[in-house]
Amino acid sequence: MGAGKTTLSTAFAEQAGRQRLDVDRIVEETSGQTIPEIFAAGESVFRERELAVALDLLGRPGSLVLDFGGGAITSPPIRELLRERAITIWLDVDVDTCWERISGSDRPLAQDETEFRRLFDERRLLYASVANAVADDLDGVILAAAGVHVERGALRRLGELVPGAGPVALVSDPHVAGIHGMEAQLALGARLSETHELPPGEEAKTLAALDRLWQELRLGRGGTIVALGGGCTTDAAGFAAAAYLRGIPWVPVPSSLVAQVDAAIGGKTAIDLPQGKNLVGAFHWPVRTVIDPALLETLPDAQRHEGMAEVVKTGLLAGEPLWELPDDRLVRRCAAFKAALCLRDPFDKG
């Protein structure tokens, strides 16, 4: 209903290397009628045809980008399908903007502003009931699709942001734990069942460090590892999660600039061998990545400079001077760029 789905879904599909399909257009093609013509026979007729198309598309293998019309959410079977088979992103745009975009068009719901506003308010609750994430721009859609949450102050809401309801093991290094560990523990609340420390830096990415962590862990298959720290911590803890009990969920909470804009995004996890770095690992996507730019305020200058080198590289690839942005926008933009690359090539095949 004027939220910009067509524009954003098209751009997202291009960035993520996915096929985009417009559900309304497929309904028209399979029916041999336009949407207004179908609606003339009654909205229930359209909803039946829409459901048939949704069942087909959501049952196909592979990753598709599906653009549903705003009214699809009123169908209980479609809501159930979206909960079970899709990552659903709600494009949340204010009602005035939506009406301005569609008024005067031939859309069935664009003929009466009062009715449009009533439906807008009514459907918001339905959107919220199925949405996995909310976005209002392309970066937001990319981040949501990759399971990346960027928010200043997110560490304080960590308990809300870690998916599931099972116990959590917090893994960090001594330095980061000393600065942010208590806040993370308080945020996790009753879900926190155990805490563990890995050595700082590359020492975390050794078999000896992970062997000790695996032996200390007491989580079951319903537990989640939360990795709070820089790229070495998230690399190691992610691989620990990938191998422990043949794989349990994990959530990186990167605290360094390098990790926030690059290392902690996507499914690559690894440890080192004497012969070289990252030689043993697994692709194990986090159930969510929680990025709090406020954590950068305690970052030593040397680590910030290291991170800015990654920002400059990302900016050059993106064709934008990202290094000129303030921290919050810089992190969000770089994270979205990396997330798009990971969505396009999740197994780093090049």
Language model features: what each stretch is:
Residues 324-350:
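Active-site segments that bind and position negatively charged phosphate/pyrophosphate groups
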Residues 22-81:
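ATP-dependent small-molecule kinase phosphotransfer cores
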Residues 239-326:
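A glycine/threonine-rich phosphate-anchoring loop and its flanking beta-alpha core
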Residues 84-124:
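A glycine- and Lys/Arg-enriched "phosphate-lid" helix/loop adjacent to the NTP-binding pocket
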Residues 143-224:
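ATP/NTP phosphate-donor binding region
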Residues 6:
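Walker A/P-loop
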Residues 11, 15, 87, 122-152:
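NTP-dependent small-molecule kinase module
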Residues 3:
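ATP-binding Walker
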